[in-house]
């Protein structure tokens, strides 16, 4: 068993987030990402952050944004987070919760397209 380099608090927060997923994240996880041939992890620690969904083979982070992300301070935090993730070689794509709830097929298609592009298929 590999030893984690993440703080116990971060790991506990990730577990809690996996248990209490918002409706859009739950829908994308169970009805969308599970249909793809690529392996995704949900609520995955990366550095000091917990990303919504992570595909290791493509080094892709998928983030879902609810209404709280409309706030200027939240947008600034998202920008810093994205810059950090970019700096460690990860690409970040974002979707609004509304898009997942109203156009799941389109969101999943785009995620699959980006994964395939990044892994060269």
Give residue spans per PLM region.
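Nucleic-acid endo/exonuclease domains
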Residues: 1-121
């Amino acid at each position: 068993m590999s030893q984690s380099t993440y703080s116990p608090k971060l790991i506990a927060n990730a577990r809690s987030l996996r248990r209490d997923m918002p409706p859009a994240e739950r829908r994308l996880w169970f009805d969308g990402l599970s249909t793809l041939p690529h392996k995704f992890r949900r609520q995955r620690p990366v550095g000091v952050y917990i990303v919504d969904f992570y595909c290791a083979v493509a080094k892709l982070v998928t983030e879902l944004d609810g209404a709280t992300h409309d706030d200027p301070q939240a947008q600034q935090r998202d920008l810093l987070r994205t810059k950090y993730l970019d700096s460690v070689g990860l690409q970040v794509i974002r979707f609004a919760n509304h898009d997942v709830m109203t156009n799941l097929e389109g969101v999943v298609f785009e995620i699959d397209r980006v994964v395939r592009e990044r892994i060269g298929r």
